[in-house]
Amino acid sequence: MRIAGVDLPRNKHVVIGLTYVYGIGRTTAKKILAKAGVPEDKKVSEVTDDEANEIRTIVTNEYKVEGQARSEQQLAIKRLMDIGCYRGLRHRRGLPARGQRTRTNARTRKGKRKTVAGKKKAGKK
């Protein structure tokens, strides 16, 4: 089954399969399935064409997914950077934006360690 340009894994439950689409998490997937009248425990391979089309129409008409969601996210971050708020500055510098410590443990945002020249060890006399 293909939704919003993403092939859903056929061996998983529909509620889990839908989370492979960017912008759809577990809660949203459950809401979509409830609206479409598809049971959550059904496998993706067992979904009928009518049910798949119903899910597809709900996703395309009511939710921002994939490229649309990504671009909206990028625009929100760009807006923060443009107005020069604290969060925008943190994004611009590539540092954590939500108050985490940065003296140690900020490697995900900072990237690989860059060694800085330090003090030389004193030799024995």
From Swiss-Prot:
Record-linked NCBIfam families: uS13_bact
This protein's encoding gene: rpsM
Record-stated family: Belongs to the universal ribosomal protein uS13 family.
Segments of this protein annotated with the region Disordered: 91-125
Organism: Chloroherpeton thalassium (strain ATCC 35110 / GB-78)
HAMAP family, per the entry: Ribosomal_uS13 (MF_01315)
Keywords in alphabetical order: Ribonucleoprotein, Ribosomal protein, RNA-binding, rRNA-binding, tRNA-binding
Protein known as: Small ribosomal subunit protein uS13
Pfam families registered for this protein in UniProt: Ribosomal_S13
